[in-house]
Amino acid sequence: MLPLLRCVPRVLGSAVPSLRAAAPASPFRQLLTPGPRLCARPFGLLSVRAGSERRPGLLRPRGPCACGCGCGLLHTEGDKAFVDFLNDEIKEERKIQKHKTLPKMSGGWELELNGTEAKLMRKVAGEKITVTFNINNSIPPTFDGEEEPTQGQKVEEQEPELTSTPNFVVEVIKNDDGKKALVLDCHYPEDEVGQEDEAESDIFSIREVSFQSSGESEWKDTNYTLNTDSLDWALYDHLMDFLADRGVDNTFADELVELSTALEHQEYISFLEDLKSFVKSQ
């Protein structure tokens, strides 16, 4: 069974997008940040009325601390239970971890990591191709209740495997014109990921195309951006062939999902370890 901490908050997080404030986003870098989340506990629990009996160890330790170790810091029985839970969670996540090291991409791609952002780079016949993606918010939400488990059937067999399908940006720079980059913003349509019925079907799509200055760290919204929703299909097919000729095809997209999923799981385990260290720190 997938650990409770990993699946439940992500499901709850997907249920409150309407509460998030709308903010302008770059048309290419779909590297989203998490929105605000609702507090699951009433604020009344965080205060104590005058004259009421104080719950030991809820907010303040009695004396130097609740456990009597004399450190003078707040750490309650709830913190201890939290740390024990995180220990079990980390063990379970390591048990189901498929890749102890990140899988390599075929085709001579070089990987460069910067936290949750990853860059894949290669050079082909005088051209530099860079693919950038971010694992944050890259796991599609899962919803319960689609199918009830039959009698005697284990629940964990019906829980879907978490797969990271990040948006990614392809940047192509030609050496004879190194100041200009062709930028293609791509994503994985939800109805295409994991489908193997149609061998010729593309598992990723191009959403937007533009030219940007290769020396700029941030791309400009003032540059003309071509949205593929209203694009002639012949032109769209040529753009997809353009990417395939440079190694960005279905095979690449499959391997990118595998790499991103392994990286996301690795970062998730690191987050749990940091959270455990923070809660138990004195």
From Swiss-Prot:
SUPFAM superfamilies registered for this protein in UniProt: Mitochondrial glycoprotein MAM33-like (SSF54529)
Residues bearing the modification N6-acetyllysine: K91
One Gene Ontology biological process: DNA damage response
Compartments, record wording: Mitochondrion matrix; Nucleus; Cell membrane; Secreted
An annotated Gene Ontology molecular function: kininogen binding
Keywords: Acetylation, Adaptive immunity, Apoptosis, Cell membrane, Complement pathway, Cytoplasm, DNA damage, Host-virus interaction, Immunity, Innate immunity, Membrane, Mitochondrion, mRNA processing, mRNA splicing, Nucleus, Phosphoprotein, Ribosome biogenesis, Secreted, Transcription, Transcription regulation, Transit peptide
Region entry Interaction with MAVS, spans: 168-213
Modified residues (Phosphoserine): S201, S205
Transit peptide: 1-70
Ranges for region C1q binding: 76-93
Sequence segments annotated as region (Disordered): 137-163
Pfam family of the protein (one): MAM33
Protein topology in the membrane: Peripheral membrane protein
Residues recorded as bearing Phosphotyrosine in the entry: Y188
Cellular component GO terms held in the UniProt record: cell surface; cytoplasm; extracellular region; mitochondrial matrix; nucleolus; nucleus; plasma membrane
Major location (coarse): mitochondrion
Role according to the record: Multifunctional and multicompartmental protein involved in inflammation and infection processes, ribosome biogenesis, protein synthesis in mitochondria, regulation of apoptosis, transcriptional regulation and pre-mRNA splicing. At the cell surface is thought to act as an endothelial receptor for plasma proteins of the complement and kallikrein-kinin cascades. Putative receptor for C1q; specifically binds to the globular 'heads' of C1q thus inhibiting C1; may perform the receptor function through a complex with C1qR/CD93.
Assigned protein family: Belongs to the MAM33 family.
Record's subunit section: Homotrimer; three monomers form a donut-shaped structure with an unusually asymmetric charge distribution on the surface. Interacts with CDK13, HRK, VTN, NFYB, ADRA1B, FOXC1, DDX21, DDX50, NCL, SRSF1 and SRSF9. Interacts with CD93; the association may represent a cell surface C1q receptor. Interacts with KRT1; the association represents a cell surface kininogen receptor. Interacts with CD209; the interaction is indicative for a C1q:C1QBP:CD209 signaling complex. Interacts with FBL and RRP1; the respective interactions with C1QBP are competitive. Probably associates with the mitoribosome.
Protein name per Swiss-Prot or TrEMBL: Complement component 1 Q subcomponent-binding protein, mitochondrial
Organism (species): Chlorocebus aethiops
Gene symbol of the encoding locus: C1QBP
